[in-house]
Amino acid sequence: MDTTRAKLKTEHPLPPLPAVAHRLLELINRDAPFDEIGAVLATDAAMAMRVLRIANSVALRGATPIASLTEAFLRLGTAQLRQLVLGLVFIHHFPRRGAFDYVAFWRHSLHVALAAQQIERRSEGLNNSGQDVYTAGLLHDIGIAYLNLSATTRYKQVIVEARSSGEPLEVVEQRLLGVNHAEAAAYLLEEWRFPANIIAVCRFHGRPEEAREGHRDLVRLIHVADELVWGLGYDNGAKRVGPEFNPQDFAKVRVDPTQHEAIVAELKTLAEQVESCLA
């Protein structure tokens, strides 16, 4: 990994995030109370308006519209608003470059985050915090966006070759770039001081058996959620075809496979929330 880190540091500069985005990530990562998060949000009018718009779309329908960040906090609670802010920071502040399909990428990522939460709630014995589950799902493929940003022309060739050959994306990345998106994501989140379990998800969600025992439950959960979302037809913007999902895979995360239809139905009700985040 030392050689990989050196290559990433030399050839793939960290994405330039606005100061407000860095501050929000810092607060979210240390589970800061919402009054601190709200104070920073208030300095970014566009972000604050997005939070209020989405909060109104997911709050109690028919209730009085939410008009302030404080009211959003009281109506939705700290956990849900923290998730909302995290998603908006990445979706609207992570730099975009080239012809890469960022909308498909973030749609896939948001669905994985929500799917992982639905699966985890039905699991018998998993002990991950809801925030960790959401964050891990949202960022599991962040290395794709990072490599596209830092090596746009070469990454376009990665996408073309991966689609035409049918090879796994990380295999083509390794051949053409000398690094893959799992390694890139781990490096990026280490530099941004994300928790070790989130970093482990980025590095190992494609091969959960390689994660260390303390992280394996969360890694396996995101692995299953990712396959479920691919099975629902949400590609990640880089490849259009992904792994097939078998409901029996729910057993890997201690969920009864008969819950498959209920989980899919719940995800369909959350589709509006996903599209609101992308708007």
Over which residues does each language-model region extend?
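Terminal helices and disordered tails flanking the catalytic cores of nucleotide-processing hydrolases
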Residues: 1-6, 21, 247-279
